[in-house]
Amino acid sequence: MLLCTYIFFIFVILIFNLKEIYNTKHKNKTKRMKKITSFLISLCIVLGFSEVQSEIKLTTSLELGSDFTFYPKPVASDGKVIVDWGDGTKKEYNVDGMWNKKVNGTQVGDTIRIFSPMQTFDCSDAHVTSVTIIDEPDLTLLDCYNNEIERTNLDISGALNLEILNCYNNPKLLFLNLSAHKKLTTLDCRHDKSDKSDPDDKGGITTIILPSEGSELENITAYNNDISSIDFSGCPNLRYINLEGNALMDINVLSLTNLRKLDIRKNHISNLDVSKNTALEKLYCDDNALTELNVFANTELMDLVLSLIHISEPTRLLSIS
């Protein structure tokens, strides 16, 4: 829609200026040249506004004047990284990817802005409170773990080709919208809970929205959060799921025919159907509300951990506890 708007404005300017140029055909050439110049300047302005620049925005809980370090891998072969540390001044750094892999500076304003296109980006362990990714189509790996990212403040909508997201141990993060990230293969958003009396520990993520179809997701590690439901129907490639210690009442994994490991310990699940998960090798489902479990179809199952219930015995089960 935005692109169409720009094209419309360009068209209007074009018609207006051509009309003016035509109407002045009997006037002197100097005036006609001014009209042409005016048109070209207007066109350049519109095109300039239409250009979207790659950018990563960060806010932190650090006091102004504090040192801040991040680890980028830029797309540019010269390793150029441009940073605004918060005062509107852009500074250029060179990251060669071998000896100098980090960028270090002093935060002088509320928002740190990094303008270079990235392949990978690491801002972990840095007191980051928000991350916003804008037009980073080459970004495939984002590490922002062990931070203080708040509620919905992880915006990766500008990194649709992201393959690996490590955002674990952000105790204030509550929401992850990954509905457009079909190329994501690995998600680690686990929550290694701190002291329960810690007022900053909100209990972990409550909502994860996955793609409704066509997802390439293979691994999800999301234990010790507060997730009550999650839809895997658009993620047929999932192989490993760890949702231990959440608030799940039920879980549907019937469409996950490639599933190898499922860990749903310490939830509130009363019914579990794994009849279609014939590739399943490891199943951990103790500390739930299960009263019965049918694993007759799970002939590859080798490791089963569950509370004391009635089960139908599989053929290749090597251990049960």
Residue ranges and their predicted role:
Residues 19, 31-36:
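Positively charged n-region of N-terminal signal peptides that target proteins for export
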Residues 309-313, 317-321:
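Single conserved hydrophobic/aromatic residue that forms the stacking wall/gate
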Residues 1-17:
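Hydrophobic alpha-helical signal peptides and transmembrane signal-/tail-anchor segments
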